[in-house]
């Protein structure tokens, strides 16, 4: 009996140590990533001409920063919308134009992290996107809910539009059946 308790205590201690080690590695990696974001953010201070479509950018590369004043939130925007990229911040849909360009720029984020408060946005709220091409202010036009497989939210638009997408319902456990969409129009750059 005493030996069993000793074995269990050793296992518990080992698991605790491993868990602590994993947590410390994750904290270190997050701090390292945040430092790289600050470096990339500093590069955004040099305006570049706005590029039209399909600029080759590496997946996971920081392309800008999104700020939503009403939510008091600012996040990095990275190229790509797969889970790997969305763990880094807000993802830019690769087949959409860059923010600030005439057409539909689509950004996606996880409902349980960067876009957890997206449902609080209302018509007229501001969304500010800063890239190496400049700072672009968008005004929310509307929000709505679609099925997860609805591709109409990523279609081209005749004006500079920003479309934000996240899974819905916000507190759903598992793979969400719907998407929450916010559409905003460029008002200033």
Model-predicted regions and their roles:
Residues 2-189:
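Solvent-exposed, non-transmembrane regions of membrane-associated and secreted proteins
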């Amino acid at each position: 009996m005493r030996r069993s308790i000793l074995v269990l205590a050793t296992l518990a201690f080992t698991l605790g140590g491993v868990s602590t080690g994993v947590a410390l590695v994750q904290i270190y990696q997050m701090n390292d990533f945040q430092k790289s974001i600050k470096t990339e953010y500093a590069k955004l201070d040099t305006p570049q001409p706005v590029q039209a479509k399909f600029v080759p950018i590496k997946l996971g590369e920081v392309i800008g920063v999104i700020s939503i004043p009403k939510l008091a939130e600012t996040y990095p925007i990275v190229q790509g919308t797969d889970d790997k990229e969305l763990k880094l911040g807000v993802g830019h849909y690769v087949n959409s134009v860059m923010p600030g360009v005439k057409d539909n720029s689509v950004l996606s984020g996880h409902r349980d992290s960067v876009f957890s408060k997206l449902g609080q946005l209302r018509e007229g709220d501001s969304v500010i996107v800063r890239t190496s091409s400049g700072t672009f202010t968008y005004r929310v036009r509307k929000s709505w809910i679609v099925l997860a497989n609805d591709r109409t939210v990523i279609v081209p638009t005749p004006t500079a539009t920003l479309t934000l997408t996240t899974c819905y319902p916000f507190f759903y456990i598992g793979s969400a059946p719907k998407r929450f969409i916010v559409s905003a129009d460029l008002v200033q750059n």
